[in-house]
């Protein structure tokens, strides 16, 4: 018997999903305190890639945790701290 595969247009259809995935992959890399202290996370769609990043007050040094996620496949393209 052939197995049916359901094809979805976008694995990451909205900002809420992108943020959930972004936080999930950033937590093991940067730690719970670092990631959660940068809430609220923001997700911006840039072409076919979700750019997920945290908030950091303007007077703070360093960068925020960032993740780039393919909208169609959900593949993590890059995780970085966005530091200068």
Predicted region positions:
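Long, terminal "pre-/pro-" and other extracytoplasmic accessory regions
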Residues: 1-84
